[in-house]
Regions:
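Glycine-rich SAM-binding Motif I of class I
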Residues: 91-95
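C-terminal substrate-binding/active-site "lid" region of AdoMet-derived donor-dependent transferases
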Residues: 158-207
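A short SAM/SAH-binding and catalytic strip from SAM-dependent methyltransferases
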Residues: 143-160, 166
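Conserved SAM-binding motif I beta-strand of class I
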Residues: 104-109
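Conserved class I S-adenosyl-L-methionine
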Residues: 79-89
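Central antiparallel beta-sheet cores of small beta-barrel/beta-sandwich binding domains
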Residues: 206-244
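S-adenosyl-L-methionine
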Residues: 30-80, 115-145
Length: 244
């Protein structure tokens, strides 16, 4: 009988300990939940980008304002242009193109918080009538209406964009901060202190065989080869051929 009483007492102590422990844990969890509920929650209006932060296949580093001016002036941006900035970040290139050069501008930015931040900057700059910020993927959005394309991406993204850019309307101007387009040689290199950029004009595709008729002495035949903006080939007329 005594052994049974001792066993009951031990079980009672164990049960009481478990109950007290559970009560403490419950109280702690309740307090923690209350604390978390009381903590202020960050909103989209509080978002501020941090230099070097990771994005989709890129990191965000703002383009220096001095280089932005040189990029846009090299591209001869005017009020007649529509500028698309691919990977718009804080929107500064699109804003500058509108505010200083009078262009209509569109920025495409993948990060929704960054895109909203750029929209606030657009409003603060007073150019909401000229600048639109799109939340989207540069490989999904249509920017074929651009007369000028600006970008600050990564080398592999430039190469992925290259065939898209080359299929744009001949004469479209392209300016890239920091990175080139592989073996598509730039028409001009831009430097500003420690920063650099590259400028291209999308060439017309004229490779192939051409015949020019209506000339004295008979037709002239052109067989043209093309590598980006570099043109070669032969000119044939009257049984003679000349290298171009």
């Amino acid at each position: 009988m005594n052994q049974i009483k001792e066993l009951i007492m031990k079980l009672s102590h164990v049960f009481l300990s478990l109950l007290l422990t559970s009560g403490l844990n419950l109280a702690y969890a309740t307090t923690l939940a209350a604390t978390n509920t009381a903590a202020p929650q960050a909103t989209a209006a509080d978002y501020k980008p941090v230099q070097g932060q990771a994005g989709k296949d890129v990191i965000w580093i703002p383009t220096p304002e001095g280089l932005i001016d040189k990029m846009l002036s090299t591209a001869k941006v005017s009020s007649q242009d529509k500028v698309f900035d691919l990977g718009a970040g804080d929107g500064i290139i699109a804003i500058t193109a509108a505010r200083k050069y009078g262009a209509q501008s569109v920025g495409i930015e993948f990060n929704p918080d960054m895109a909203q931040f750029a929209r606030r900057k657009v409003a603060e700059a007073g150019v909401a009538d000229k600048v639109k910020i799109i939340t989207g993927d540069i490989f999904q959005e249509d920017f074929s209406s651009a007369t000028v394309v600006t970008l600050y991406l990564m080398p592999q993204l430039n190469l992925k964009l290259r065939p898209i850019l080359l299929n744009m309307k001949p004469g479209t101007r392209v300016v890239s901060h920091a990175f080139n387009m592989g073996d598509w040689e730039p028409d001009e290199r831009i430097a500003d202190q420690h920063a650099r950029a590259y400028f291209w004009v999308v060439p017309a595709q004229i490779e192939g065989a051409w015949v020019v008729s209506g000339l004295d002495g008979g037709p002239m035949r052109l067989n043209l080869s093309q590598s980006y903006q570099q043109i070669g080939g032969t000119l044939s007329r009257g049984g003679q051929s000349f290298a171009l």
